[in-house]
């Protein structure tokens, strides 16, 4: 024991100043890039573009830039061009170096902290440019200012040569060109055009009148898009509702400024039952909402109730409409510009400034009250839609109680047809939603009972895109799923109570199976989205073919764009001598016995599963509404445009 203590003391004494590492300049960024850009995977790679684009957007917000161009160059590098004032090139007093060099080599340097350069800013703590420089093999900047073109180049964050004048110009602006470092971005350095284009379009919506374009110069991938919306977020709402039936044609739009905080709101009601509210602060999408959404929601509910009571659409003795009632079918975009935004969490997903609640509430209330008074016919339609939603909510109340559970892992109230697992470890547990009783039987027999649960469903579940809340909660299959998951429903939904952290959709490999899968994904997207966002949702990939020699299946072929090539290769492989392989086609899960289903589709060691994610909520919302909503024309157009990719089940 004494020897052990001596050894411990020796170890403690060895921890001294010589073991403290000091990272200078941008070394810290290269050492821990995830701290600055979130990850070094695809998301972090694209974050580099946003850091540079955000600087140009800041110039636009300040009123000095009107046109931004983004290029994916032929070598997969990025160029961002703006027509702003140009980054300062004079000497920065503290560093003794040109300001533009300081911006790209010193963390936390930028025009965003003093309060004079930019009234509002979307940049992350002002570190963006230097972080991009640190994580690029090469970066160069051209500044068009004071009649001269100034140029400087960097490699992995280090200065290659001093700032120099390389020509004359009669324009102003900044051009930044960079190449991501493959030593940092080991997963991929290939930019996704669609990811960049969607965000650039969003920025054009959020900055009314701004012209912003994206051009892809890569061989075989050449394309470009130009975005410019004089209607701003009003145009954004029209875009979101493009495939929906609207209650009134022109979105309600209001903007105002109070105490230095600018607020814009655009909204429009549709005939759907779903709510789509998107909020932004300084152009940053606040996925988790925040105080601007709180102010908007409170004002919307209060103003509609006041109008309904004053105009006798709601009687004095009738209950007020709830927020849930008045938001049914609503599409809204809220955008605030704040000189000192406070975001909760490192990823800026929730606005935390408490003063924004009352400012948003007041500005929107005044404008919305005016609109209702000036448009009585539209006002009545809005109130009547809320009243219908209220009646459906009351009818659904009893059904909702069925989905509530005392505890996430309590099994006393689980649906009778659920074959549950024995483990209480949600992190390990898997719930398979299986199409049909016969396949459900095979899955129950073939599963690992310790951590795999089976919930069979009969036929096609309800299309929630077209259904009222009372019908949704009256549906037995839907109730069974919510009860089995243990997450609750609606306002009671809590993803942390999920009894399984893998929710696997397992349907037949035919058109009916694809339809059931789509119905389930629609349900999950609309009413269990946190489960989707947590990465819990998967689609099983059962084999589509089995290659048999005699009575033995030698190889299974998984579905995919190369499935026919796989099949051809397998047939050639087993066509040896006199043996003639045959092909077994699996159209239904029930065509496999329990052992085959386990081996091919459920065994974690062998199976192939596709994880379902949502990269773009606005686009996903539009697609679900188009495919599953009431309007036939957009769906028919989509089918005609994509018919070449369709699967015929004949």
From Swiss-Prot:
Cofactor, how bound (note): Binds two Mg(2+) per subunit. The magnesium ions form salt bridges with both the protein and the DNA. Can also accept other divalent metal cations, such as Mn(2+) or Ca(2+).
One example GO MF annotation: DNA binding
SMART domains the record matches: HATPase_c, TOP2c
Keyword Magnesium part of the UniProt annotation: yes
Keywords (A to Z) from UniProt: ATP-binding, Cytoplasm, DNA-binding, Isomerase, Magnesium, Metal-binding, Nucleotide-binding, Topoisomerase
Function: A type II topoisomerase that negatively supercoils closed circular double-stranded (ds) DNA in an ATP-dependent manner to modulate DNA topology and maintain chromosomes in an underwound state. Negative supercoiling favors strand separation, and DNA replication, transcription, recombination and repair, all of which involve strand separation. Also able to catalyze the interconversion of other topological isomers of dsDNA rings, including catenanes and knotted rings. Type II topoisomerases break and join 2 DNA strands simultaneously in an ATP-dependent manner.
Additional comment: Few gyrases are as efficient as E.coli at forming negative supercoils. Not all organisms have 2 type II topoisomerases; in organisms with a single type II topoisomerase this enzyme also has to decatenate newly replicated chromosomes.
Protein name, per record: DNA gyrase subunit B
Record organism: Streptococcus pyogenes serotype M3 (strain ATCC BAA-595 / MGAS315)
Gene expressing this chain: gyrB
